[in-house]
């Protein structure tokens, strides 16, 4: 069960937040939403978030070469852009979705070392997550891939970013 609430009732942080999320939010019935900060950008650069300021980071990293997200996003983006570019010019100014910082293994864009590029961007993303986490904070992520190589890339990049593995819960 969900409830749509007006942003005014949700205590939006400021007018710019209201413009970004529209005038309603979908929340579980009975829960009072807290203040939120919405930002769009790369996980490799979270400069808008202070160091050691977050308790928990929850994410779902890209799946190596399995899914090229920005190319799939272009299908929807070009249509959404027609409607939203005047209201959100900072997000819909480009003709297509940005692809230069997409953390995927894509031989068409990185012909020499696509897997190394993927791992390098994952490491940069994890380093930013590590920087913003409070001491004792936790990173939780889900990763679903049937091949070993992407798992190795994810784990190596986690360790290179300063994390250690505490628990895994494999899905069978």
Predicted feature locations:
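A short glycine-rich, Lys/Arg-flanked "PGG" loop and its adjoining helix->strand segment in the class I
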Residues: 119-135, 156-161
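Nucleic-acid modification enzymes, centered on SAM-dependent nucleic-acid methyltransferases
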Residues: 1-50, 66-111, 125, 145, ...
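Short glycine-centered segments of the SAM/dcSAM-binding site in methyltransferase folds
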Residues: 138
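Glycine-rich phosphate-binding "P-loop"
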Residues: 110-118
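Conserved proline-anchored active-site loop of SAM-dependent methyltransferases
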Residues: 48-72, 129-132, 141-144, 158
């Amino acid at each position: 069960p969900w409830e749509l609430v007006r942003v005014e009732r949700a205590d939006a942080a400021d007018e710019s937040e209201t413009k970004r999320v529209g005038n309603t939010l979908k929340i579980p019935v009975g829960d009072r939403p807290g203040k939120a900060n919405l930002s769009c950008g790369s996980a490799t650069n979270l400069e808008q978030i202070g160091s050691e300021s977050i308790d928990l980071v929850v994410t779902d990293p890209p799946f190596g070469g399995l899914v090229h997200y920005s190319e799939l996003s272009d299908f929807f983006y070009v249509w959404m852009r027609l409607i939203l570019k005047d209201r959100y010019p900072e997000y819909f100014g480009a003709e297509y979705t940005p692809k230069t910082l997409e953390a995927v293994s894509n031989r068409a864009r990185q012909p020499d070392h696509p897997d190394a590029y993927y791992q390098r961007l994952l490491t940069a993303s994890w380093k930013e997550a590590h920087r913003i986490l409070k001491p004792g904070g936790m990173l939780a992520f889900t990763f679903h891939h049937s091949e070993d190589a992407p798992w190795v890339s994810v784990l190596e990049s986690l360790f290179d970013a300063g994390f250690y593995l505490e628990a895994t819960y494999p899905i069978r």
